Design a protein with these regions (language model features):
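Residue-level signal for pocket-adjacent positions within structured domains
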Residues: 14, 138-141, 163, 185-186
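Glycine-rich beta-strand-to-loop/alpha-helix junction loops that act as flexible
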Residues: 131, 163-168, 184-188
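C-terminal binding/interaction regions
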Residues: 179, 183
Length: 211
């Protein structure tokens, strides 16, 4: 396995819409200081050159804190900058093709909403799964909340680790206690905090208490 359950405990997913007066680099560093265990760089608007530059800078930053950086969707960019891996959705590149491009030692995470998708992703070589949206989410308007029983069934249907995704924050994360997850993937629950470092630390304490 290319990633441990411990590295999936509190997984930060970047979102440029929360930047305000800060740079993404500054926000990510605050999250790292607060204790995030994995960072996913997700960009939907940058051109390839800017995305590559940002990826290289964040990779160096994350490695300074001994935290892996993975890239959302863009397998070619992940390979180019030697990122630690990728996260791909059901409509993105096939897992076996991503593995061929990246090599055996890179992290491949996959979104899985159903037991069938979870089992198929594990069989194809995924290292971990992201399942949800457990509480709905502002980052994807069409993401309806998943029944927590179904989320738990997804976790129990595979041997690889599963993280909860979707609308998770310090106010609701304790509702996930006992659901067999490895950790949580969080966007606004980290980056929308007025004090990102403090908010991250408080969220990490809650996540650690339920897994």
């Amino acid at each position: 396995m290319n990633i441990t359950r411990e590295q999936l405990k509190l997984y930060a997913v970047t979102d440029r819409s929360w930047l305000g007066s800060e740079t993404l680099y500054e926000q990510v560093e605050k999250a790292l200081k607060g204790g995030v265990t994995l960072v996913q760089l997700r960009e939907k608007t940058l051109d390839e050159a800017a995305f590559e530059k940002e990826g290289q800078e964040l990779l160096e930053l994350c490695h300074h804190y001994n935290v892996p950086l993975i890239i959302n969707d863009n397998v070619e960019l992940a390979k180019k900058i030697h990122a630690d891996g990728v996260h791909i959705g059901q409509s993105d590149m096939e897992i076996k093709n991503a593995r061929e491009l990246l090599g055996a030692d890179k992290i491949i995470g996959v979104t899985a909403k159903t037991i069938e998708q979870a089992k198929a992703a594990e069989a194809a070589g995924a290292d971990y799964l992201g399942s949800g949206a457990v509480f709905g989410t502002s980052t994807k308007a069409d993401a309806k909340p998943m029944e927590l029983e179904l989320f738990q069934e997804n976790c129990e249907s595979v041997t690889i680790p599963v993280v909860a995704i979707g609308g998770i924050n310090a106010d609701n994360v304790l509702l996930l206690k006992g659901r067999k997850m490895a950790g949580t993937a969080v966007v606004s629950g980290i980056f929308a905090c007025e004090d990102i470092e403090k908010g991250t630390r408080e969220l990490l304490e809650k996540v650690a208490s339920i897994i």
